[in-house]
Amino acid sequence: MAIQTSNLGYPRIGLQREWKKTLEAFWSNKINEEQFLTTMKEIRLQHVKVQQEKGIELIPIGDFTYYDHVLDTAYMLGFIPSRFSEFTSYLDVYFAMARGSKDHVASEMTKWFNTNYHYIVPEYEEGLQISLKDNRPLRLYEEAKQELGVDGKPVILGPYTFLKLAKGYTQEQFATILKQLVAPYVQLLSELHAAGAQIIQVDEPIFASLTKEEVQQAKEIYEAIRKEVPNATLLLQTYFDSVEENYEEIITFPVSSIGLDFVHGKEGNLNAISKYGFPADKTLAVGCIDGRNIWRADLDEVLTLFTTLQKQVQTKDLIVQPSCSLLHTPIDKTEETHLSTELFDALAFANQKLEELVLIHSALTQGTESISNELETYRNVHHTIRSSAARNREDVKAARTALKEEDFSRPLPFEKRYELQQVALKLPLLPTTTIGSFPQTTEVRQTRKEWRNGIISNEQYEQFIEKETEKWIRYQEEIGLDVLVHGEFERTDMVEYFGERLAGFSFTKNGWVQSYGSRCVKPPVIYGDVAFINGMTIKETVYAQSLTEKVVKGMLTGPVTILNWSFVRNDIPRKEVSYQIALALRHEIELLESSGIRVIQVDEPALREGMPLKEKDWDAYITWAVQSFLLATSSVANETQIHTHMCYSNFEDIVDAIRALDADVISIETSRSHGEFIDTLKHTTYEKGIGLGVYDIHSPRVPSKDEMYKIVEQSLQVCDPKYFWINPDCGLKTRRTEEVIPALEHMVQAAKDARSLLKTNA
């Protein structure tokens, strides 16, 4: 039996975020197109070289992108919205789709399955001519071959997942459009095969959650493709969960290899193999290293997995690979020497995961004695971190044990609370607010850097933060907003900020991962029991409130978002970690309330993304996610108004969960998704406070008052004006001041116009 090492995808951003810096330099006209393309090529080839040097045999080609791999596929197949027809060059069209332009909104952006990566949603329009507009995978395959002598493994997004992720068609049209994808995929695969590609990875993560009818539909497409390209070696790759429910059918697909996730879908995939076996004429690609977390693998557990598989699988070959693309992990841990030895030793970033694949390959091909020293090291590392004091706090265990049913609910129902809050807050009809953050200018970032490097004192830094806060309180007053925010100038990241102030967290220096486009985040590491230490937001919020007679919101990140946007310890259930975070935030919320803050926002933008892919698993997740939010927020007085915020998700799946959060007001992204949530509310009622975002903050364009008014008008057709709020889609941290102020002025004017109309019609 031949055994090969493979990788599904490599982080794009570069060890020092060179990719991000190159993108942003190009967007700001600091480099020209030729310089941009040259630098991107250097980064792309460097990533291939690293994987080659680590000993990976099947190196992914085509996983590299200038923004997003789904957008790459949309452009390649001609899914280009007509509103961008004025643009002629590839990069102009491509980035207009991703970021919008002065006159046109960007394509929608949403979460990639249940990860914190965002993809650009492909748009189908009537009359669209689907064809292979650009065989980018072929160009990159030939580039790696010519420049480095690497016969790589082209990676493409499969036709079924691609179309399922797209929008703009009716369900009745789906089958017809799917058939139209056959010809361009045939051409794509034919050209790759003709160029010498030995194996082509076709990603179909959607296969983890399809109905039996959908799987049959997908199979027919693969049969049509195989008929035209009989000799191409295709690896059908699934990930993020098992394909247990449809495994029996999937293993009959006309492909040469099938990739399964034995980390996040281990139990289901093993059950399926035990029941149905695996085709002897296909290669099994075993996703055995976690591509979504940062912990060293349990090599003993992985080798036991292969022992089990080799007893049950009579395949000719095996491939050893990560569970999914390493896009979701930082690149290399070698710079993290500031961490404690027990934590550093327990980590494995992308490059270390590649090394683990090679270790496993050695054990499988040469026997476990060939890696006996490494096995002993791994066992010691796991024992040390498991038995550490940080993971065994008695106070945290006692607080969890003491929880009672009443800790998870507010004293009064929403309607009665809201009446009391209206009396206390004295807000107008259709109150206006923002989501929390204001522009993190070059000056803000530079001053923070100087403070962290010891160039300026704590006192100087605090004075600067107070100056920025006061400036933006005055801006908000002048604009005419009703509920103000302090601006979050002291925060680099909405999760990192809280993690730095809670026990149980640690932070990397260079643990960056891509969130969307050039936006990179550095997730905290939850390695121990989480506990409250001191007040985290009191000083800045109370200072902001002292500057104005208007209401200032306290701003916190919710427990489920902190959990989902962190790298989380894997020795206890995620539910338990979430409850620990919730208890710490509960303490902070009580401190804010006792300090006179009457509106407190607890953001949960990541609640939806944490949902399992399979609908049968949703209820269990939603139950503890909602309970975590309630645990954090339920100890305040009825007069204290709890807000929450969510963005970029398929909300129709979780309307009931949103309702169960029992937040007094929820703000939700609406404009970038082109009003889809408004459509959802046409079919259900939401009887609590709600603000549907009236403009997309991820685009530099300043929307007109009329655009925003139109969204307000549409929203009021499905929302009770008594409970309706007006706000942007999301925080304004990434925007420039000269974009923010006119946009908010337009928003306030739209609110005034809507109030006038409501009074006229009353």
Swiss-Prot record:
HAMAP family: Meth_synth. It is an enzyme of class 2 (transferase). Belongs to the vitamin-B12 independent methionine synthase family. GO terms for molecular function: 5-methyltetrahydropteroyltriglutamate-homocysteine S-methyltransferase activity; zinc ion binding. GO terms for biological process: methionine biosynthetic process; methylation. 5-methyltetrahydropteroyltri-L-glutamate binds at R17, E18, W19, K20, K111, R519, C520, W565, E609. It comes from Bacillus anthracis. The lineage of its organism: Bacteria, Bacillati, Bacillota, Bacilli, Bacillales. Catalyzes the transfer of a methyl group from 5-methyltetrahydrofolate to homocysteine resulting in methionine formation. NCBIfam families: met_syn_B12ind, PRK05222.1. Its cofactor is Zn(2+). Keywords: Amino-acid biosynthesis, Metal-binding, Methionine biosynthesis, Methyltransferase, Repeat, Transferase, Zinc. InterPro entries: Cbl-indep_Met_Synth_N, Cobalamin-indep_Met_synthase, Met_Synth_C/arc, UROD/MetE-like_sf. Binds 1 zinc ion per subunit. This is 5-methyltetrahydropteroyltriglutamate--homocysteine methyltransferase. L-homocysteine binds at I435, G436, S437, E488, D603.
